Amino acid sequence: MEHRLHRTDRRLAEAGSVLEFYKDTMVLPDGQVQIWDYVHHKKGGGACAVPVLDDGRILLIRQYRPAIDRETLELPAGAKDSSGEDPAVTAARELEEETGYRPGRMTKLVHILTAVAWCNESTDIYLAQDLKPVEGQSLDEAEEIEICSFTLDELCRMIYAGTIQDAKTVAGIMAYRSMLAMEEQKEEQKKPDTQNRSDSPKRSDTLLDKMHRLILRARTG
C-alpha cells in the first residue's frame, strides 16, 4: 500500500531519561503541512507477566498512578533495561521485583503496540507459571505496591465492569482466557468422533461459540 501521508522532518523538542518528545513535519494526502507530536521510547517499551499460581489464581498489583491520579489494578510489568533485552527476562524480573515470585516457566501470549497514534512503545505479554516465592518484593523507592490475587472469572467480570482498565492488563487477561479456550478445544478434538461425518462442518463454530459463552458468563457473573 502506498502511503500519501509522509514525514519530511523530525525535530527533538525535549529529551527525558526514558522518553524523547519530537515535533514531526507531516505532509497530508491533500498537500497540507502539519506539525504532529511523536513520543519515542528509548528502550522500545517493556514486558508484562500474567502470573498464575498453582491453584489457578492470578496475581495482580494495586498501585497509585500519578498520570491519572488514582490507583489501578495491573499485571506486573516494567520497562526493558536496554532495547536489546529479551522481553521474557524483563517480564520475569519485574514479576519477581513487584510480587516476590520467580517464574519457572514463561510462555509468550501476545505482543501489543500500546499507543500507535503517537508513540513507538510496545509490550510483550507472557504467561508465568510454576511460581516460587523468593525473598519478597524488591521495589524502587517510588513504588508502593499491594499484591492481590483473583480467579480468571473474577478478573473478566472486573474488566467488563470497568474496574480494570489498564490496557496491557486487559490484553493479557483476555489473551490468557483465549489460550485456555483454544487448548480446551484441541482436547475436545482429540476425543473419538462419535458424530456423523455430515455434522463435521459445524465443528468450525465450536471455538467461537465457546468464547461467546465465556464472555457472557464473565459479564453476568
Model regions: which residues?
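Nudix hydrolase/Nudix homology domain
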Residues: 1-5, 71, 141-197, 201-221
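Conserved Nudix-box catalytic region and its N-terminal flanking loop in Nudix hydrolases
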Residues: 2-4, 9, 39, 44, ...
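Acidic, metal-coordinating catalytic segment for phosphate/diphosphate chemistry
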Residues: 11-48, 54
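Acidic pyrophosphate-coordinating catalytic loop
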Residues: 12-17, 29, 41, 112-123, ...
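Short loop segments at secondary-structure junctions
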Residues: 29-31, 53-57, 64, 129-133, ...
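Unchanged
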Residues: 45-48, 53, 79-167, 215-217
